[in-house]
Structures are given as C-alpha cells and as structure tokens.
Amino acid sequence: LGCTETCPSALFASEPGGFAGLLGVPVPGLELKLTPVAGKLEARYRGKNVFPGYWRQPELTARAFDEEGFYCTGDALRFVDVTNPNKGMIFDGRIAEDFKLNTGTWVHVGLLRSQMIAAGHGLVQDVVITGHDNEFIGAIVIPGLDSCRKIAGLSGSTLEVLVSHPAVRHELQKILNELAGKSTGSATLIERAVFADFTLSLDRGEITDKGSINQKMIIQNHPEVVARLYATEIDESIV
C-alpha cells in the first residue's frame, strides 16, 4: 500500500499466501500509527519517505498531519491477527467515504462496495454507496456492459437500453436479495439501487488519477440520481 504522499510505498507484503486486501507490514524506517476514527483504525505515517507538505498550500498541509506529525491517510486498516502484528495489516476501507444514516448509524462504504461487486459477478463493475443523513442505504450501480449484454441477449445496444432491460434489472434484484440475506442491520442493508445511466467523467473528478471511482464527486455531480433513490414515489428505474 502506498500513496503519492508516501513515495514509493508505506506497507509491503512479502510473505507467501497473499490475498486481496493484504497490505503487509510497514517498510523499514516508517512509523505506522493506528488511530481510532469513526469506529475504525486510520493509518497514519511518519518517516523519511513521507512528504513534508503540499507545495504552497499551508492550510491543506496543516490539516494533513496530526499533532505528532503523522500524515493522516484516511485509509482504515485492521490486523490480520491481533495477537501477531508481524502477520501484517488488511485494508479496511476509506474512512473519508464512510457516513452516518440519520439514525446515527455508521455505514462503512468500502465493505459494502466490495461485497456488492463480488456478488455482482461482472454485472456490477463498481458501485457508489449513498445514504448520508438519510433513513437507509442506496446504491448507484456502475454496470458491467459485457455482462449486461449477455444477460439481456443483446449486442451493441446503448447503455440506456441495457440498464432498463427487464432481465438485467431482475438480475440486480437477485443481487440485492442475496446481500439482504447476509445483512446484520441498517448499516449493511442496501434497500434500493439504480443503474448509472451516465458515463463516468475524468474531467469532472468522478474517476481518480489511479483509475478508481470518486464516490463523493459522483454523488455531488448527479444529485438527480440520488434523489430518485430516496423519492417517496419510486420510479421504474429503481430496484
């Protein structure tokens, strides 16, 4: 695991038996501090490979470091084995993406996102989790078009045609039902979902320079889609 601010890396996994999400242990010379934030442990770094600050942006720099000089990453980590720290750390989502429902319940976006992508088997290319200050969790699904075409039995169709096809919508409902069966409460239950009928824009900040989606910007840029998820009268695009 690494970021621009910890060039070239912060943690490294070198032991056999690696798996998705395994980050390993801090590189030599780097201090890792785990700070409780929003019910998780935020990774904070201090060392010679950590940048000193943002160029000519003193206010942003001040916010990026804590009182002990550790860089605050916004990444949540957890131990592979709490009794043996040498086994390394596991990525536990982005704290900056997490939010509270209007009940005060924390929603951990990274966990829900990974679960829905896994359950989607190609239909769900990615997903934006919604629900900040709302009663329930919603999802804006970025569709895997090849999977949509296969399910719908169509080739060369437009995005709008594919995501509105009954067979594709039915498959999304099955995914929601499967996840609901594993839910432990409002913090893990996705009640409504809608396919994104728009193409993600790099220019509008919806895709990061690393190729991942920017949840916050997608929600900000498409308020009409979020509004449909929480409307009293549900339209036909909502699953």
Q: Locations of the language-model features?
A:
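C-terminal boundary motif of the adenylate-forming
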Residues: A76, A119-S147, A180
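Flexible glycine-/small-residue-rich
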Residues: L34-P36, Y45-G47, G93, V141-P143
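Conserved ATP-binding loop and adjacent catalytic segment of the adenylate-forming AMP-binding
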Residues: L1-E42, N49-G53, A62-F70
